[in-house]
UniProtKB/Swiss-Prot annotation:
EC numbers for this chain: 2.7.7.56
Protein name listed in UniProt: Ribonuclease PH
Entry-linked SUPFAM superfamilies: Ribonuclease PH domain 2-like, Ribosomal protein S5 domain 2-like
PANTHER family, alphabetized: EXOSOME COMPLEX COMPONENT, EXOSOME COMPLEX COMPONENT RRP41
Top-rank taxon: Bacteria
Keywords attached to this entry: Nucleotidyltransferase, RNA-binding, rRNA processing, Transferase, tRNA processing, tRNA-binding
Described function: Phosphorolytic 3'-5' exoribonuclease that plays an important role in tRNA 3'-end maturation. Removes nucleotide residues following the 3'-CCA terminus of tRNAs; can also add nucleotides to the ends of RNA molecules by using nucleoside diphosphates as substrates, but this may not be physiologically important. Probably plays a role in initiation of 16S rRNA degradation (leading to ribosome degradation) during starvation.
Length: 239
């Protein structure tokens, strides 16, 4: 089996994490997984949703979108259609769930963190790139809150990151690009903590059912890739 990119089965794409990419947000990152590029910002607002008022804890929510020409053909803006699509809603909920798992909300004070992930170029793995980049932007936003004296302690419990794995031409592969993803028999998106715990595993057999041993092989690939991604996050956060 030869991957279209020429990468080994267990090889990540080239990953770059550029901090402070925009001027105004408390945390901002440009994350690049190969040709997939996502701008991730984290904005802080005082106050929490109504269901949390008076409880002394914070909240985090996420939104996800793509530029119309992030893909090979132009897509209509969801705003012009008047509603978000099911895929968009699914992805932004995944991003929010994943990042909330990194935090102790009781230490945030009554502040809301708004995570915005905007795909400027898509070549597969946009949701996993979004989670990975947003984690770094989130840490920068928490530093701002700490300087303001808005925190009630250390809210960061753990780092998180995400990566895709799949079965391509009968073999498990790591970090699928669009050509692989569109032809894969199976596609998994895996979210993990830096302590090795799983937060979420989303999987679909598109071509043929996958066997337990293939599932375990994909998880092992994800763990290997994740270890490398956590090191890249750590390196990006060095001031």
């Amino acid at each position: 089996m030869k991957r279209p990119s020429g990468r080994a089965a267990d090889q990540l794409r080239s990953i770059r994490i550029t901090r402070n990419y925009t001027k105004h947000a408390e945390g901002s990152v440009l994350v690049e997984f190969g040709d997939t590029k996502v701008i991730c910002t984290v904005s802080v607002e005082s106050g929490v949703p109504r269901f949390l008022k008076g409880q002394g804890q914070g909240w985090l929510t996420a939104e996800y979108g793509m530029l119309p020409r992030a893909t090979g053909e132009r897509n209509q803006r969801e705003a012009s259609r008047g509603k978000q699509g099911g895929r968009t809603l699914e992805i932004q909920r995944l991003i929010g769930r994943s990042l909330r798992a990194a935090l102790d909300m009781s230490k945030l004070g009554e502040n809301t963190l708004y995570v915005d992930c905007d795909v400027i170029q898509a070549d597969g793995g946009t949701r996993t790139a979004s989670i990975t980049g947003a984690m770094v932007a989130l840490i920068d936003a928490l530093k701002v809150l700490k300087k303001r004296g808005s925190l009630k302690g250390e809210p960061l419990k753990q780092m998180i990151a995400a990566v895709s794995v799949g079965i391509y031409q009968g073999e498990p592969v790591l970090d699928l690009d669009y050509l692989e993803d569109s032809a894969a028999e199976t596609d998994l998106n895996v979210v993990m903590t830096n302590a090795g715990g799983f937060i979420e595993v989303q999987g679909t057999a598109e071509g043929a059912p996958f066997q337990p041993e293939e599932f375990n092989a994909m998880l092992a690939l994800a763990q290997k890739g994740m270890n490398e991604i956590f090191e890249l996050q750590k390196a990006a956060l060095v001031d």
